[in-house]
């Protein structure tokens, strides 16, 4: 438990209105308490960490000067919103973030009136805030709308689409965009914009000009000298900072300013709050600010398990191999013998397992920043020239490049391999990061081959199979570890479209896809049923399915994907096309967005863990429950 007496000011804040009761001179102390509280609370429970530390002062300044929730703050992505949650009535629940029944890891409209827009994916804030500002303008409403977006999120095209629209509107809506520039997304930010922002913040000449003005005029500037200094600085800024870019798009640019300097933030926001039209404030922050270890390892402290803040993160010893680890090793091994292989990631080098590859093959590694659409069409272009690109991407982010997958890759039957990480149930990050839809939206694409491994060894073989296949392929694997089947060092391939019979039984055939093979086998062996590791979602093993249909009374398909349009639907479609009438029971994820909880809890909730599969079978066929295999034996 956290001792609230250690936070005398913070404990008085239940809403931003309480924050606004403090004097400006007290806000520095409030910020220190908030930062320390964040360190202590996340240390106890785990969660997103470094990003929130970097926006403590900015969060306080915004809630202090703006009349939230009437004025609306739209946070991009949401990694940085723990301070926002603490100041908006959720301080005592912050330790429940990511836990079942607890606070959501990102802003969520159903959770608080201060969460104006649900987020989780990047670069949506400006579009959403613009929509709010337009409606406010139409209604004659004077409320303020602010979008807070990081420099990493500003690498996505959607952000510029929104800027372009907002800056070109007439009459222009009142919108403030705050560019939180910390040189990071989750991994290090990359690309031309990042370099340009770096030139702006690192310009010795501009800083010298600014400091010279301070020395000459001090704090005793008249209105005339203040206007002169502003024009003088704006003139020189055009030579060093991205003001030209944003102002050409119709935004008035202010900055860059120190995002940890509360007086500077308050001064800038007081002015901007009175201005009309599109405004952009550029603030410089440090991810992990105030916790030295996080400042020194911003990637490692992006999201953390519970830890002792006095000691920092403890490096784990030998750990069980994850599916991401399997992909990482396979990629380097295949690259060693296949010079055509090129690897692409949309800003997820660490998460997708590309660190080693980026070090060993830097000329064959392409981090395109948060630009999934570009990543996929880039891969398509590479494939037209004989390369074999591998796009390493989370399932949830593949949704953002779906048109490019269909139009630019599949339509042209180009040789692109998609390594789809975090497929199916993901867990604590909640609905915004779930991969519950991917089998459905990939299976329906013509020319696409789609596989899901039952274990680590099979994952490696599927990646090799996909690499050597002519045409678009997706290998979809889950977050975390598997059953513990150690992969071979070889680069063996599987026969395309051939399933694996795991156990021969009678009456009922359990058809497991991906991670659901394990519970299917556990239950099927105990009940004497046939168990199949389907391996391929597309193409299905037609020969085996027709044979099983002749010898079994019913099929049960089991998948960690929504039932609608999923792998089980493919089985039903195949039998229907063959004129075979056979009962099929589909077990899978519900037609709903699953909330945050552990993977184990979500699989159990959906009824596709071993106990759930067992219960589903017995509810339909009670005669299976003989003395030799009671329900308690299956877990």
From Swiss-Prot:
Pathway: Metabolic intermediate biosynthesis; 1-deoxy-D-xylulose 5-phosphate biosynthesis; 1-deoxy-D-xylulose 5-phosphate from D-glyceraldehyde 3-phosphate and pyruvate: step 1/1. SUPFAM superfamilies: Thiamin diphosphate-binding fold (THDP-binding), TK C-terminal domain-like. Binds 1 Mg(2+) ion per subunit. Binds 1 thiamine pyrophosphate per subunit. GO terms for molecular function: 1-deoxy-D-xylulose-5-phosphate synthase activity; magnesium ion binding; thiamine pyrophosphate binding. SMART domains: Transket_pyr. It comes from the Bacteria. One of its GO terms (biological process) is thiamine biosynthetic process. Its EC number is 2.2.1.7. GO terms for cellular component: cytosol. Mg(2+) binds at residues 151, 182. It catalyses: D-glyceraldehyde 3-phosphate + pyruvate + H(+) = 1-deoxy-D-xylulose 5-phosphate + CO2. Keywords: Isoprene biosynthesis, Magnesium, Metal-binding, Thiamine biosynthesis, Thiamine pyrophosphate, Transferase. InterPro entries: Dxylulose-5-P_synthase (IPR005477), THDP-binding (IPR029061), Transketo_C/PFOR_II (IPR009014), Transketolase-like_Pyr-bd (IPR005475), Transketolase_BS (IPR020826), Transketolase_C (IPR033248), Transketolase_CS (IPR049557). Its cofactor is Mg(2+); thiamine diphosphate. Thiamine diphosphate binds at residues 79, 120-122, 152-153, 182, 291, 372. Catalyzes the acyloin condensation reaction between C atoms 2 and 3 of pyruvate and glyceraldehyde 3-phosphate to yield 1-deoxy-D-xylulose-5-phosphate (DXP). Homodimer. Belongs to the transketolase family. DXPS subfamily. NCBIfam families: dxs, PRK05444.2-2. HAMAP family: DXP_synth (MF_00315). This is 1-deoxy-D-xylulose-5-phosphate synthase. The lineage of its organism: Bacteria, Pseudomonadati, Pseudomonadota, Gammaproteobacteria, Lysobacterales.
């Amino acid at each position: 438990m956290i001792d609230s007496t250690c936070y005398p000011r913070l404990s008085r804040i239940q809403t931003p209105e309480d924050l606004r009761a403090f004097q400006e001179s007290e806000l520095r102390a409030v910020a220190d308490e908030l930062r320390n509280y964040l360190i202590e609370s996340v240390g106890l429970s785990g969660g997103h960490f470094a990003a929130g530390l970097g926006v403590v002062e900015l969060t306080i300044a915004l809630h202090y000067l703006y009349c939230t929730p009437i004025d609306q703050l739209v946070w991009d992505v949401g990694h940085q919103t723990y301070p926002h949650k603490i100041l908006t009535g959720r301080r005592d629940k912050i330790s429940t973030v990511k836990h079942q029944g607890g606070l959501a890891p990102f802003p969520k409209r159903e959770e608080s009136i201060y969460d104006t827009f649900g987020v989780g994916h990047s670069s949506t804030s400006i579009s959403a805030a613009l929509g709010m500002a337009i409606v406010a303008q139409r209604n004659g409403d004077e409320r303020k709308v602010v979008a807070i977006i990081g420099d990493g999120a500003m690498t996505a095209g959607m952000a510029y689409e929104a800027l372009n629209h907002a800056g070109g509107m007439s009459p222009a809506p009142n919108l403030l965009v705050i560019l939180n520039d910390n040189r990071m997304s989750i991994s290090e930010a990359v690309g031309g914009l990042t370099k340009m922002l770096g030139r702006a913040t690192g310009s010795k000449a501009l800083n010298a000009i600014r400091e010279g003005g301070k020395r000459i005029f001090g704090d005793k500037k008249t209105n005339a000298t203040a206007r002169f200094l502003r024009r003088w600085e704006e003139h020189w800024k055009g030579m060093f900072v991205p003001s030209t870019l944003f102002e050409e798009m119709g935004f008035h640019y202010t900055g860059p300013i120190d995002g940890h300097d509360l007086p500077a933030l308050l001064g800038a926001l007081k002015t901007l709050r009175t201005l009309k039209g599109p405004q952009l404030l550029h603030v410089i922050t440090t991810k992990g600010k105030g916790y030295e270890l996080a400042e020194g390892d911003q990637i490692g402290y992006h999201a953390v398990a519970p830890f002792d803040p006095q000691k920092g993160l403890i490096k784990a010893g030998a750990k069980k191999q994850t599916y991401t680890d399997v992909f990482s090793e396979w990629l380097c091994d295949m690259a060693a013998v296949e010079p055509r292989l090129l690897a692409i990631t949309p800003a997820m080098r660490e998460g997708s397992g590309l660190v080693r590859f980026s070090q060993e093959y830097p000329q064959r590694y392409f981090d395109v920043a948060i630009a999934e659409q570009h990543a996929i069409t880039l891969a398509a272009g590479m494939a037209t020239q004989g390369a074999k690109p591998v796009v390493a991407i989370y399932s949830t982010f593949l949704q953002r490049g779906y048109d490019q997958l269909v139009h630019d890759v599949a339509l042209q039957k180009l040789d692109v391999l998609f390594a789809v990480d975090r497929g199916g149930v993901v867990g604590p990050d909640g609905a915004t990061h779930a991969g519950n839809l991917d089998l459905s939206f990939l299976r329906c694409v013509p020319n696409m081959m789609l596989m899901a491994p039952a274990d680590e060894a099979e994952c490696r073989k599927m990646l090799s199979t996909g690499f050597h296949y002519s045409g678009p392929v997706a290998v979809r694997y889950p977050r975390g570890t598997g059953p513990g089947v150690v992969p071979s060092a070889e680069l063996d391939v599987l026969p395309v479209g051939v399933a694996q019979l795991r156990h021969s039984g009678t009456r009922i055939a359990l058809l497991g896809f991906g991670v659901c093979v394990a519970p299917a086998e556990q239950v099927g062996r105990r009940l004497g049923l046939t168990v199949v590791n389907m391996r391929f979602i597309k193409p299905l093993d037609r020969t085996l399915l027709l044979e099983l249909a002749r010898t079994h009374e019913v099929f049960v398909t089991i998948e960690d994907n929504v039932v609608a349009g999923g792998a089980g639907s493919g089985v039903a479609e195949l039998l229907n096309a063959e004129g075979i009438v056979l009962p099929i029971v589909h077990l899978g994820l519900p037609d709903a967005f699953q909330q945050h909880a552990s993977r184990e809890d979500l699989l159990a909730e959906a009824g596709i863990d071993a106990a759930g599969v067992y219960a589903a079978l017995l509810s339909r066929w009670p005669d299976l429950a003989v003395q030799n295999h009671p329900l308690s034996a299956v877990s």
